[in-house]
């Protein structure tokens, strides 16, 4: 029996994105996208001896699966996620010469996140929430919990035990700021500093959003179990 999260291990969309990005950006063919050296470029296109195509293949392509997963969680639809990642890859390609050899995964996911929110703003504005109103509550939550955000909590234990379909449904109900934070941490394994960089908020806000996201997911799953038992 397939689970609700089977799409996370399905690489077909990732391969499709690779092909479409290659076609749209005139990038190397599929063999080159898989890791072979791209053809030599003009000297002015090179950064430290590496042309833009080879740099893109080295920096961006290894993180396409994570990029698609984040876009899929944010948009809630596989085809929409493919469109978002394609656009994000083109943005990344245009800006690849400015990448400073830092955390490539965080850099790519930041672009994907921005692209996803732009797409949502144009296509589903009602799904977006204003995050400014959350800040005061989040600061209070950080003060209450302190800085030990890594510790196991009842929320994380219940989430770990939940079946995949229930978990996906509960995560989809989260407001985007909470959803992306939980996905980046509990699904994709980014640390708090990386999440803060991707989302553009302080680490304390990341901690608060993660705690509140886990609590909401736990509440949703618990209610589902209660309703099923009743």
Predicted regions and their residues:
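Hydrophobic-face residues of short alpha-helical interaction/recognition segments
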Residues: 67, 71, 108, 112-120
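A short pre-motif secondary-structure segment
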Residues: 181-185
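Intrinsic, short, N-terminal disordered tails of RNA polymerase sigma-factor systems
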Residues: 1-62, 121, 127-177, 190-200, ...
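Amphipathic, Lys/Arg- and hydrophobic-enriched alpha-helical face
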Residues: 59-78, 93-95, 171, 222-223
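Structural recognition of an alpha-helix C-terminal capping motif at a helix-to-coil junction
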Residues: 83-90, 94, 102-114
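Residues within helix-turn-helix
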Residues: 79, 193, 204-207
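Residue-level detection of the helix-turn-helix DNA-binding "recognition helix"
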Residues: 86, 97, 113, 121, ...
């Amino acid at each position: 029996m397939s689970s609700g999260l089977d799409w996370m291990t399905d690489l077909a969309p990732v391969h499709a994105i690779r092909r479409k990005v290659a076609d749209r950006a005139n990038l190397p063919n599929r063999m080159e996208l898989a890791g072979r050296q791209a053809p030599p470029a003009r000297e002015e296109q090179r950064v430290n001896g590496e042309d833009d195509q080879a740099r893109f293949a080295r920096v961006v392509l290894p993180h396409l699966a994570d990029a698609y997963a984040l876009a899929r969680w944010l948009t809630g639809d596989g085809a929409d996620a493919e469109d978002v990642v394609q656009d994000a890859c083109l943005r990344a390609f245009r800006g690849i010469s400015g990448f400073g050899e830092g955390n490539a995964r965080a850099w790519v996911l930041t672009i994907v996140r921005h692209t996803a929110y732009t797409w949502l703003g144009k296509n589903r504005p009602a799904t977006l929430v204003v995050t400014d109103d959350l800040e005061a509550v989040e600061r209070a939550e950080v003060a209450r919990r302190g800085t030990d955000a890594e510790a196991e909590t009842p929320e994380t234990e219940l989430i770990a035990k939940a079946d995949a379909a229930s978990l996906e449904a509960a995560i989809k109900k989260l407001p985007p700021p909470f959803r992306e934070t939980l996905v980046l941490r509990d699904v994709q394994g980014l640390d708090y500093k990386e999440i803060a960089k991707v989302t553009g908020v302080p680490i304390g806000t990341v901690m608060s959003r993660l705690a509140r996201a886990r609590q909401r997911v736990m509440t949703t799953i618990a209610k589902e179990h209660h309703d099923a038992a009743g």
